[in-house]
């Protein structure tokens, strides 16, 4: 995360300073800086626009307000904030090796990246747990609306608690006329505390939740692919329901795998640096770090693209959101897809199914349901 980058870059930067004030061993040619700036600008624009659109699609349409989709909103909000408040500012710091943004933002920058990443991955974990209950144990009670809000609030509180130590020990220092945002651990065991903190953070916001999701989606996959549709229903709603659930599993597995791939090199970078600090003294490490940081931050922009490509309701939502663009032409079906309420006959035909489905397949939470999620959304389409 960006906060880790600040710790490392700031703590080692003074040893890389040249004798000339304002010039560091990390200085790069203007054309190279322009290329990196363009890459990061594209990342931030795509991530902020895409995740803001996902949030709008869900919150602006009653049919999309489901347990799973509220966790999707939480994930999108964390990714949006990560791109807006971490990617851009940390790029400026890493490329110039000077902190321009003041003491208060130094504390924030050492608090928020860990918080946002924790919220992102545990929102994915909550989705996996919710789908596990819905598919593997379909007759067990689902999360209520208050329960969903409580889980989301709990995720944010735990995330802030995990990030607090780094925020607490962050400070502003001056090094040969250059301002640095650094994390100063207690002097007695500073290096040991830094290593321990890195390992704990990586375990809690990467290894543990990925293992939980691997187990959950493995069980979900086995359950779905072993399930058979009765012969007399091979062309009916049951087959569509099964296909929708399988497509959901593929979608969320793609989201999780993308996240894991984007962040793995970045975490490995800091684990290696904790044991071999001399790697930070090489001039090329700035380019390595900028590449790894871009890859990690790029995880914030892929989810909206995945939703749009694999989920037809989100495709409809994106068409409506960008209808002002000359190359985007939303249809009446796109509007119906997000607002249509099926007929009573369709409800009766589907009321026997207890399970709920990703994005399109759940009943939207409302006061009328007394806060308890019910069965499947009426009018479940062929895909989730």
Swiss-Prot record:
Residues 57-69, 130-149, 219-251, 311-384 are cytoplasmic. It comes from the Eukaryota. SMART domains: 7TM_GPCR_Srsx. Glycans are attached at residues 11, 18-19. This is Substance-K receptor. It is a multi-pass membrane protein. InterPro entries: GPCR_Rhodpsn, GPCR_Rhodpsn_7TM, Neurokn_rcpt, NK2_rcpt. Residues 1-32, 91-107, 171-196, 273-290 are extracellular. The keyword Transmembrane applies. The chain crosses the membrane at residues 33-56, 70-90, 108-129, 150-170, 197-218, 252-272, 291-310. Its main location: membrane.
């Amino acid at each position: 995360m960006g906060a880790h980058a600040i710790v490392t870059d700031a703590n080692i930067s003074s040893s890389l300073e040249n004798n000339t004030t304002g010039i560091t061993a990390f200085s790069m040619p203007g054309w190279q800086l322009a290329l990196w700036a363009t890459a990061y600008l594209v990342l931030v624009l795509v991530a902020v626009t895409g995740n803001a659109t996902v949030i709008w699609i869900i919150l602006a349409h009653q049919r999309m307000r489901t347990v799973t989709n509220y966790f999707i909103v939480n994930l999108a909000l964390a990714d949006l904030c990560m791109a807006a408040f971490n990617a851009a500012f940390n790029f400026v710091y890493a490329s110039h090796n000077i902190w321009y943004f003041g003491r208060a933002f130094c504390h924030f920058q050492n608090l928020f990246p860990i918080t946002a990443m924790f919220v992102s991955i545990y929102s994915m974990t909550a989705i996996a747990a919710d789908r596990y209950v819905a598919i593997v144990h379909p007759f067990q009670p689902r999360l209520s609306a208050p329960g969903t809000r409580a889980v989301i609030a709990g995720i944010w509180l735990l995330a802030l608690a995990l990030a607090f130590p780094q925020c607490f020990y962050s400070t502003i220092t001056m090094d040969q006329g250059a301002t640095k945002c650094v994390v100063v651990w207690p002097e007695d065991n500073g290096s040991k505390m830094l290593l321990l903190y890195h390992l704990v953070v990586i375990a809690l916001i990467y290894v543990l939740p990925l293992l939980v999701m691997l187990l959950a989606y493995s069980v979900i996959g086995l359950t779905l692919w072993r399930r058979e549709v009765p012969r007399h229903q091979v062309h009916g709603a049951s087959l569509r329901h099964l296909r929708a659930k399988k497509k959901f599993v593929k979608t969320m597995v793609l989201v999780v795998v993308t996240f894991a791939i984007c962040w793995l090199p970045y975490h490995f970078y800091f684990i290696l640096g904790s044991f071999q600090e001399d790697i930070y003294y090489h001039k090329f490490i700035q380019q390595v770090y900028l590449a790894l940081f871009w890859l990690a931050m790029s995880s914030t922009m892929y989810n909206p693209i995945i939703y749009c490509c694999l989920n037809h309701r989100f495709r409809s939502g994106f068409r409506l959101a960008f209808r002002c663009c000359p190359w985007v032409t939303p249809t009446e079906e796109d509007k119906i897809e997000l607002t249509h309420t099926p007929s009573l006959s369709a409800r009766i035909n589907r009321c026997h199914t207890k399970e709920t489905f990703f994005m399109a397949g759940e009943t939207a939470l409302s006061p009328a349901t007394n806060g308890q999620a019910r069965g499947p959304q009426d009018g479940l389409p062929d895909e989730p």
